[in-house]
């Protein structure tokens, strides 16, 4: 396991032991099977609310501020974003009546609340990747859910009662990409739910404890540590003259022969035009290097062998244009480099890559239409070829619609 993966898993496992209110033990396989025979969701029966429903409560603002003041590489907004990332749920209430239909309450774009009924099929139990002694119960919606696509799949733990607090809770992940992506998701992301009739004061006490412990012990002191090392711009890889890379275009032209909507075959120029549309160009950088740890939280921007800029960063409030991703700002307000502000995904897929949107201001980053993408510079040539092949194949398929 790489040091980056170790860091992510360690942080995630530690955070979850605090964030998740119940000291949950795994559901025995026999109990899950017995429950599933009658009604897979019967074990969840009751009315529940996610902890995240109260994350913006005024009572918590001083808690965020006090903790952020002691965290040199997190603004108050950055700490709130980190906590939100860990505990957020796409619903504000969930009612299980013992059947396989769940009544979710969601908040609409205009701020109003709407109840959505979702019928699910049980897809079996899966051990947690980060804790093999515990199980997920996994579900898939019978029909597509138009109101909120992220409810199509969800995985949950059976409710448990915390011996110290007496609070009953469970943990859940929701998504639209499949059960596999949830089971193997970021260890930091597990939304805790408590009973809907739990007094607000008790919920806020629990949330205060979560914030304090996460800030003091669970988040990495240098939030860029997850990306440590040098990354290469995917466009730089696409432009690489090595035969192994250039052969990708020959392969794709044959694979998509006669399918160009303009008529005839695609050319290499056609494929590169799609690359530039999706990834942007390599005009601003060919490589970026993350240096995080031992009191540093820096990024070095490279063009070839020339250092373009170097700056320290703080994790900041999420950008409105990319609310689901981590956001960073240069610690020096006078820094006007291309990466003064950026929003970034976590590394994902194989080979690991990430996307980010950057600019000299948050507003400039929001206007970026492409999604600049980088892969780790130390991956093998074979992995680089696979990354370009998968990306370009996806672009070509998209261009035909």
Where are these regions (language model features)?
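Calycin-type beta-barrel ligand-binding domains and close structural analogs
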Residues: 54, 97-217, 235-237, 280-401
């Amino acid at each position: 396991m790489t040091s980056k993966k170790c860091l992510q898993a360690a942080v995630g496992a530690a955070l979850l032991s605090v964030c998740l209110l119940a000291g949950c033990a795994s559901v025995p396989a026999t109990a899950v099977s017995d429950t599933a025979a009658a009604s897979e969701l019967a074990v969840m029966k009751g009315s529940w609310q996610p902890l995240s429903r109260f994350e913006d409560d005024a009572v918590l603002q001083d808690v965020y501020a006090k903790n952020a003041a002691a965290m040199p590489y997190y603004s108050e907004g950055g700490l709130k974003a980190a906590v939100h990332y860990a505990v957020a749920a796409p619903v504000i209430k969930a009612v299980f009546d013992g059947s396989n239909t769940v009544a979710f309450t969601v908040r609409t774009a205009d701020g109003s609340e709407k109840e959505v009924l979702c019928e699910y099929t049980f897809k079996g139990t899966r051990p947690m990747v980060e804790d093999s002694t515990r199980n997920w119960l996994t579900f898939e919606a019978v029909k597509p859910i138009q109101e909120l696509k992220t409810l199509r799949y969800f995985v949950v733990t059976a409710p448990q009662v915390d011996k110290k607090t007496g609070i009953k809770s469970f943990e859940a992940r929701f998504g639209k990409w499949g059960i596999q992506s949830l089971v193997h998701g970021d260890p930091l992301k597990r939304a805790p739910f408590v009973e809907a009739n739990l007094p607000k004061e008790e919920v806020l006490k629990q949330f205060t404890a979560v914030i304090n412990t996460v800030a003091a012990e669970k988040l990495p002191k240098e939030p860029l540590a997850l990306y440590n090392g040098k990354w290469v711009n995917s466009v730089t890889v696409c432009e690489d003259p090595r035969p192994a890379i250039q052969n990708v275009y020959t392969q794709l032209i044959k694979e998509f022969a006669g399918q160009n909507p303009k008529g005839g075959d695609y050319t290499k120029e056609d494929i590169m035009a799609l690359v530039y549309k999706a990834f942007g160009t390599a005009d601003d950088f060919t490589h970026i290097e993350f240096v995080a740890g031992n009191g540093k939280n820096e990024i070095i921007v490279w063009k070839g062998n020339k250092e373009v800029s170097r700056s320290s960063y703080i994790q900041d409030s999420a950008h409105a244009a990319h609310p689901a991703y981590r956001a960073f700002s240069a610690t020096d307000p006078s820094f006007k480099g291309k990466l003064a502000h950026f929003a970034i995904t976590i590394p994902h897929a194989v080979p690991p890559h990430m996307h980010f949107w950057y600019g000299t201001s948050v507003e400039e980053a929001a206007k970026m239409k492409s999604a600049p993408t980088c892969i780790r510079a130390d991956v093998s040539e074979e992995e680089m070829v696979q990354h370009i092949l998968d990306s370009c194949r996806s672009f070509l398929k998209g261009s035909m619609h």
